[in-house]
Amino acid sequence: MSKIIGIDLGTTNSCVAVLEGGEVKVIPNPEGNRTTPSVVAFKNGERLVGEVAKRQAITNPNTIISIKRHMGTDYKVEIEGKQYTPQEISAIILQYLKSYAEDYLGEPVTRAVITVPAYFNDAQRQATKDAGRIAGLEVERIINEPTAAALAYGLDKEEDQTILVYDLGGGTFDVSILELGDGVFEVKATAGDNHLGGDDFDQVIIDYLVNQFKQEHGIDLSKDKMALQRLKDAAEKAKKELSGVTQTQISLPFISANENGPLHLEMTLTRAKFEELSAHLVERTMGPVRQALQDAGLTPADIDKVILVGGSTRIPAVQEAIKRELGKEPHKGVNPDEVVAIGAAIQGGVIAGEVKDVVLLDVTPLSLGIETMGGVFTKLIERNTTIPTSKSQVFTTAADNQTTVDIHVLQGERPMAADNKSLGRFQLTGIPPAPRGVPQIEVTFDIDANGIVHVRAKDLGTNKEQSITIKSSSGLSEEEIQRMIKEAEENAEADRKRKEAAELRNEADQLIFMTDKTLKEVEGKVSADEIKKAQDAKEALKAALEKNDIDDIRKKKDALQEAVQQLSIKLYEQAAKQAQSAGSQGGAANHKDNVVDAEFEEVNDDK
């Protein structure tokens, strides 16, 4: 059975880990880095993922970044005349992570635990699960990122403690409060903001640079796509540098031009200025911190440890704000970029039975309910309820002789249905005609361990039942998922062939170089006939490379290899013959008794 890998599918970066021999290993990508940019690009029909995609983002408009922000929506991105859903783009990233995990483990990988922000709603969780399926992974569990981080932090901790996980990623923000003790990880409360992260901190720097440049030169760089991508890269770099130094130089030569010639952007950005620009973002993260404490019925003094997750928590102003709010230094013992994937791999170990005595009790981040008369949102399951859970409530009809009930399922905290996230609708039909208020309709909500919702409605009079697994308007049908799985497999096969072809071309080029070298060495040592045969084979391979016919390249490469081998054999045979004749001559010389007298002089050491 395949190992279960742990995947942190992030907005800006992703990470994959696995439990091996009781120890979690973060798997490096082919470039040797332990995290991979969540970037996908399309270029001449080829798909690029990770570092290579990010590197060419400036010049390639068909580059997709931060797709996680659109999970669970009906957003589509059009590339080269084809529309892609966020699930498909995420699946391309997952496929890449899966492929290098397989290279590392030396075996196929088909099972995974994938993390999501704690504040993801049902549609976003379902979309993540679908992305995993499209990538050829059986998603064993969807686990909340802060919970995964707590699992990684607390696995070897003996004492009972209450921890707050502050997770500021590239595009999402979560806070979870957990109680740890005796192998039980119990989430007490969770809060967050799905549209707040490192990208927003980059954006304030970009806006500042655009404004400064506009004031100085009267040119709006935000209208220039290529300039904007350069600004984005520079802003991200400056943000990272300002975590270690108090000022940084931003230098972007030839960023634009006017009638007088090229224009360059040269600017010094201080940490103080960056903190001023991003102060409102840092303050926005404090709202969910206070909310989580309130929901858990705790005060800052009750928190034993604060765990920081996500690269953006390296920003000094963020750490200062946490210290001010909670009155304690954040714990620095975990790697904020890797801790979530490590936790996911541990959860994989729990599912596979490799990790014993660990119980994970997570919660639902948002309240669940249905729309009732007057457009009111009636909650059935309150937020921060431990999952898995099930809850039933009896409702009745709103009109006389009503034979159908339309059930509208929602998720959120607002009192009116229209202000909450609609998860889907379904109908219970065949209710016997009766005066309003008489029929008894029982609605049951189930939330599984992945935080995914299943709903049943039952007419208690007839025992007629209708059930659905919630499919939001942005969700994919089974046929769509199957089609995408098939396309993903075909693309993986095409990628494999493309890689094989590139390797074959490299081998052919290498062989041509070696042939030229060998031909120089054998000049005058083997027959002209043999040399011509090798030269012809070399020219034939060059011609095949020009035509780019893979089968022909393979054939001509084998033929040239054979010809070069024959040359080498002839060369060795000749060398062996020469050595033999030289050996026999040397032997004959030794038979002559020519003794040469050597003159010598005695040296007196006592001189």
Swiss-Prot record:
The keyword Glycoprotein does not apply. The modification Phosphothreonine is found at residue 172. SUPFAM superfamilies: Actin-like ATPase domain (SSF53067), Heat shock protein 70kD (HSP70), C-terminal subdomain (SSF100934), Heat shock protein 70kD (HSP70), peptide-binding domain (SSF100920). Keywords: ATP-binding, Chaperone, Nucleotide-binding, Phosphoprotein, Stress response. Induction: By stress conditions e.g. heat shock. It comes from the Bacteria. One of its GO terms (molecular function) is ATP-dependent protein folding chaperone. Residues 575-589 have a biased composition (Low complexity). Residues 575-607 are annotated as: Disordered. Pfam families: HSP70. Residues 596-607 have a biased composition (Acidic residues). Acts as a chaperone. NCBIfam families: PRK00290.1, prok_dnaK. Belongs to the heat shock protein 70 family. This is Chaperone protein DnaK. It comes from Geobacillus kaustophilus (strain HTA426).
